[in-house]
């Protein structure tokens, strides 16, 4: 279902519901179901956050680093559980022990690593680490869950 490693952006897009500009994972390079995954995000000059965070000194927002790690965690969960990605969502429940130790800038490759600390039912506790050129930029424990997808309420026309 996942396809052979490495998974490219097309494979990631087939698994996750996220689309640009919120698709924060470009590839998966290593995956051991139920245990660990590695992936990456290539940061372009045209990323939506570049102009405003911060003008003249762009730095990737910490929440987007965490989102990148969570998306890699979702791929790991889909490799572990017999789930249909079209019928479930992988959602954040909480973040603990988040540390941001180095700014991440456009033009860099953000390497991502998630390890399962605990899994119970559809709830996952992951240790995530983000690095650039081998230097740790961020680390956090992510509490996530797999939930059945709910139909979207109908949109009201104005």
Identify the function of each model-found stretch.
Residues 1-59, 84-89, 101-105, 117-123, ...:
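Non-catalytic linker/capping segments at the edges of enzyme domains
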Residues 34, 64, 68, 123-125:
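An amphipathic alpha-helix/helix-turn recognition signal
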Residues 59-85:
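Active-site helix/loop of acyl-thioester processing domains in fatty-acid/polyketide metabolism
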Residues 79, 83, 91-99:
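Conserved short alpha-helical segments that host acidic/polar catalytic motifs at enzyme active sites
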Residues 127-129:
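Generic short beta-strand
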């Amino acid at each position: 279902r996942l396809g052979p490693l490495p998974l490219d952006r097309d494979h990631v897009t087939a698994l996750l519901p996220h689309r640009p500009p919120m698709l924060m994972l470009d590839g998966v390079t290593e995956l051991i179901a139920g245990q660990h995954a590695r992936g990456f995000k290539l940061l372009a000059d045209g990323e939506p956050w570049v102009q405003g965070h911060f003008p003249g000194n762009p730095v990737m927002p910490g929440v987007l680093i965490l989102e990148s790690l969570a998306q890699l965690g979702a791929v790991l969960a889909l490799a572990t559980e017999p789930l249909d990605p079209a019928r479930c969502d992988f959602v954040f429940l909480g973040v603990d022990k988040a540390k941001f130790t180095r700014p991440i800038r456009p033009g860099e490759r953000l390497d991502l690593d998630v390890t399962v600390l605990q899994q119970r039912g559809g709830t996952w506790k992951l240790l995530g680490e983000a690095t650039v050129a081998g230097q740790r930029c961020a680390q956090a424990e992510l509490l996530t869950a797999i939930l059945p997808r709910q139909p979207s309420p109908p949109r009201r026309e104005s």
